[in-house]
Amino acid sequence: MDSYSIIIKPHVTEKTMNLIDKNNEITFVVKRDANKGQIKRAFEELYEEKVARVTTHITPRGNKVAFIKLVEEEMAEELAVKIGVF
């Protein structure tokens, strides 16, 4: 799968904004059939940042959301500004 087809868009809510500040995690809506390894590789390829872990869940609306924890502190906030979340 292509990296651009795996990661669809940032998932922005009040909760995800708090995760950026407190847990160094950023969230994205991803392709439903993508697994954690594919999501990690796609994120590292697109944004050139190291990933510590990926957790996922499927929302009641049927969207798959990936919570991506970054290795370096403060990188999630900088990345969010870079991609236009803030």
From Swiss-Prot:
Keyword GTP-binding part of the UniProt annotation: no
GO biological process assignments: translation
GO MF term (any one): rRNA binding
Pfam families linked to this entry: Ribosomal_L23
Quaternary data: Part of the 50S ribosomal subunit. Contacts protein L29.
Family stated for the protein in its record: Belongs to the universal ribosomal protein uL23 family.
Record keywords, A-Z: Ribonucleoprotein, Ribosomal protein, RNA-binding, rRNA-binding
Protein name (record): Large ribosomal subunit protein uL23
GO cellular component: ribonucleoprotein complex; ribosome
